[in-house]
């Protein structure tokens, strides 16, 4: 049959087949396009899932790495250990400085150097939480074989400290940092308890006996309650007799003694110990107790620089010294502003 307009011969059957083939091709193309889109969407969804999974995995690994880093830091640094278990602890420069000195004190005990350290701090400066609770717990984490005696003017205080240290040692978070330190269940009273490695914590009141107990580290935290008691010569002599005849005799070879107090009187325990050291040096006594004294007044009486050798002086000894406060500044203004300290001083 011819095409009327073109005059060309057209096979209708062939044209129908051609159109059918084109339609089939278009249908197949649409099907393939749908399949391709479906596959691409599935791949995109899988890629998105993989990216999310990888991101979550990286975040998890990052969180685990961060946690391990925090544990390592808490194990190495006392101030970080304190912050980990007491997130609300208000740590100022003074607390960081005290922690640094306590770390060195512990190392000197390990090295059998018989360190003697006095820290003079005002009341309510956070010293007991640091010195009588966190420091002993940190010590036992690193050296569970060490024996610690903690003393204060009333035995109820070190017993309270002892309970807190014991609770810390049993805390799962503590165990994640110091997995080798465990409480000996057969000896776990609040007044005296042991670790499975033979170390432990003994609470003692000034003036009470410490029969049969020795120490690698002896802590005396405020041996006199307040200024009123410090004015009593009888009380001061009682403290001195207890120190020289009871506490001091319990020191193991190479043991360290740490005295932390508020100075209420020139002839208090610290005053007597420093006078004894002065006399021993004058007489050329060997193996004397050589006390390192660090004083942190509530209000700075001079500019204060911490030197590389640990001393705090009015002027820097070397360019590496760090200025911690100016004359007239409060020790820890976030806790006790200078205005409040001045009011307390006036009363």
Regions from the PLM with identified roles:
Residues 228-347:
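Non-catalytic, compositionally simple segments
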């Amino acid at each position: 049959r011819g095409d009327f307009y073109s005059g060309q011969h057209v096979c209708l059957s062939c044209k129908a087949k051609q159109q059918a083939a084109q339609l089939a091709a278009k249908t197949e193309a649409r099907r393939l396009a749908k399949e391709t889109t479906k596959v691409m969407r599935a791949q995109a969804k899988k890629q998105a899932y993989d990216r999310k999974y990888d991101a979550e995995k990286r975040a998890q690994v990052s969180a685990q790495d961060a946690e391990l880093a925090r544990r390592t830091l808490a194990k190495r640094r006392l101030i970080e250990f304190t912050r980990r278990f007491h997130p609300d602890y208000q740590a100022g420069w003074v607390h960081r400085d005290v922690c640094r000195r306590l770390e060195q004190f512990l190392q000197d005990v390990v090295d059998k150097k018989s360190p003697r350290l006095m820290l003079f701090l005002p009341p309510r400066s956070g010293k007991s939480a640091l010195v009588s609770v966190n420091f002993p717990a940190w010590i036992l984490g690193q050296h569970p074989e060490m024996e610690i005696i903690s003393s204060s003017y009333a035995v109820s205080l070190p017993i309270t400290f002892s309970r807190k240290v014991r609770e810390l040692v049993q805390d799962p978070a503590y165990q994640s940092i110091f997995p080798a330190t465990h409480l000996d269940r057969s000896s776990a009273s609040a007044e005296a308890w042991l670790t499975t490695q033979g170390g432990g914590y003994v609470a003692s009141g000034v003036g009470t006996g410490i029969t049969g107990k020795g120490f690698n580290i002896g802590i005396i935290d405020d041996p006199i309650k307040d200024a009123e008691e410090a004015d009593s010569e009888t009380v001061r002599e009682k403290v001195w007799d207890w120190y020289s005849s009871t506490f001091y005799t319990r020191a193991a070879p190479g043991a360290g003694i740490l005295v932390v107090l508020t100075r209420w009187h020139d002839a208090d325990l610290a005053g007597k110990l420093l006078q004894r050291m002065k006399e021993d040096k004058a007489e050329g006594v060997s193996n004397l107790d050589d006390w390192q004294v660090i004083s942190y007044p509530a209000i700075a009486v001079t500019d204060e620089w911490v030197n590389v050798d640990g001393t705090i002086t009015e002027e820097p000894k070397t360019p590496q010294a760090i200025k911690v406060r100016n004359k007239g500044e409060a020790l820890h203004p976030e806790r006790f502003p200078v205005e409040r300290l001045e009011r307390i001083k006036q009363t």
